[in-house]
Amino acid sequence: MGYVINIQAIKKQIELSPQSCGVYQMIGDKDKVLYVGKAKNLKSRLSNYLRYENLSERTKFMLSQVIKVEVLVTENEIDALLLEARLIKSLKPPYNIIFKDGRSYPYIVISKHNYPRIAQYRGKFKKGEFHYYGPFISVAAVKQTMLSLQKTFLLRVCSDQYFASTKRPCIEYQIKRCSAPCVGKITKDDYCQSVKQTRDTLLGRNEKVKKQLSSTMEKCSKEENYELAAIYRDRLKFLEQIQMQSMDFSFEKDADFFGIARKEDLACIGVLSFRNKDNYGSTPYFVENCSDHPDDEILSTFLIKLYNSANIPPAQIYVSDFVTGKEIIEQALHNVTHKPIKALHAKSKKEHNLLKFVYDNSQRSLEQKLTDYKNNLEKFEELSKIFLLPNIPKRVEVYDNSHTSGNQQVGVMVVAGKEGFLKSEYRKFTIKGEILGDDYEMMREVLTRRFSNNTKDVVPDFLLIDGGPGHISVVQNVLNTLNINVPFACMAKGSYRNAGNERFYMPNREDFTLKNDSKVMLYLQSLRNEAHRFAITSHRKKRDKQFFVSPLSKITSIGDKRKNALMSHFGSVENISKASLAEIQNVARISKELAEVILKHVDNKE
């Protein structure tokens, strides 16, 4: 395919560019930055764009939109690497390498509460709220470890709000994953001992915890308290399961191992993480549109992005021998993390085996991802034919609403692409209008808010609406008013509101149905079901939040931060009512007068 490229704009900048380090920007219409790149030699790097026959189709298409090129000269390669990362993060150029699942590592946290809870956490550290353990590279590893810890130590996972207001044990107690401190099924001292043992386990002190559990079990047996002894026996068994999860691989030092596999225009970077001598799991990160970039460059950019956030890097990372610029990576990571980090090649047999393991996993993940891409592309091709779309869709948005008799009304949007469901792009809309359960008006508000303001630059290729023929005019009216040209269809369930025999409604077209067992019908049902699931869970969260309202929420003279501090410290409104004025003043850092207002309020349960 031929593209018209503004050769003169590139040649002009080549003439002006020095043979030194820096960053260049490809700029298109309306000064939109299309691409940001770094180079050891700006003149040489830009000259490569004139070798047209060596460029990928994607790069050729990008160059056809370039109006001008700008460069920023830096002192050295490290500054160029960091500047490129900052510009990509702030400008989000559409033609730069896309890293998927570039979120921060997940952690396990234990709250600083009188009866601490254990939870999965991802994001910036909140000083004073939690003890953090990790990071874990894999979310699956966090969930598995959490489950084992719950079975072993029976810590609560409920919110502080629920803990303070509940009157009876929840399902977690019934299935033996919680000791129900909320209703006094365990003493505070015993619960705190369980918390301490959990923390020791997460810090790698498993042998210490095993000795404590064994000693307690033997003591219970001698006292002929066989029921309690059996409980500690089960705890020991679960603790051994936790240890077995990391027996296949271990490493003496905190370290991350990186491997990269490539095929077609996709790369997969695998990360294997060790903390406190334990294997914290691995996860694949996918890199799209990278055919024009060498492995060395992809990995360098990825490392800066990975550790330039809430992620806490280890003192050393291991990379394959193909990575030649180790010193540059070390200096760049030091600049963004303010910690000395060594980039190492494998030397010992164990190090080589771990690098091979992470590479092999990356290769398998890459093959699976490409298979998923192919399958989803086939589904999108079918959608294009059935709904007479102008192009094969790349982004499909599905909409649904949920409410209970007009209360806690929410609308949701789920997104699907060639990768599958794009959960990071889901949105939920709390209905603001006085609509009272009118599905049509709820959909009108949701779509109006979705396509207004700054969201027009992310326009989908197809909309699927959970609704019937009555929704057609509503959707069409919103899109016409906002000058949005997107094809859509409404999907209504069959006669008895069950899956199967769904009918589809579109503007200026007779309604139709599809074979129930066809692949495309099953795919459309999965899209609708995912939107329905997200709508229901969003609605329930909103409903439950309203149900579990603390009496403190009615006090307008103190803010949420102080209310949370009081609930976190005392555990319940009842405990606050028993506290002294001085205690309340100290915890919430408020005046005596305001403390008196709080006590009066919780005593009267106003």
Swiss-Prot record:
Keywords: Cytoplasm, DNA damage, DNA excision, DNA repair, Excision nuclease, SOS response. PROSITE patterns: GIY_YIG, UVR, UVRC. Gene3D superfamilies: 5' to 3' exonuclease, C-terminal subdomain (1.10.150.20), GIY-YIG endonuclease (3.40.1440.10), UvrC, RNAse H endonuclease domain (3.30.420.340). Residues 19-97 form the GIY-YIG domain. GO terms for biological process: nucleotide-excision repair; SOS response. It comes from the Bacteria. Residues 207-242 form the UVR domain. InterPro entries: GIY-YIG_endonuc (IPR000305), GIY-YIG_endonuc_sf (IPR035901), GIY-YIG_UvrC_Cho (IPR047296), RuvA_2-like (IPR010994), UVR_dom (IPR001943), UVR_dom_sf (IPR036876), UvrABC_protein_C (IPR050066), UvrC (IPR004791). This is UvrABC system protein C. It comes from Wolbachia sp. subsp. Brugia malayi (strain TRS).
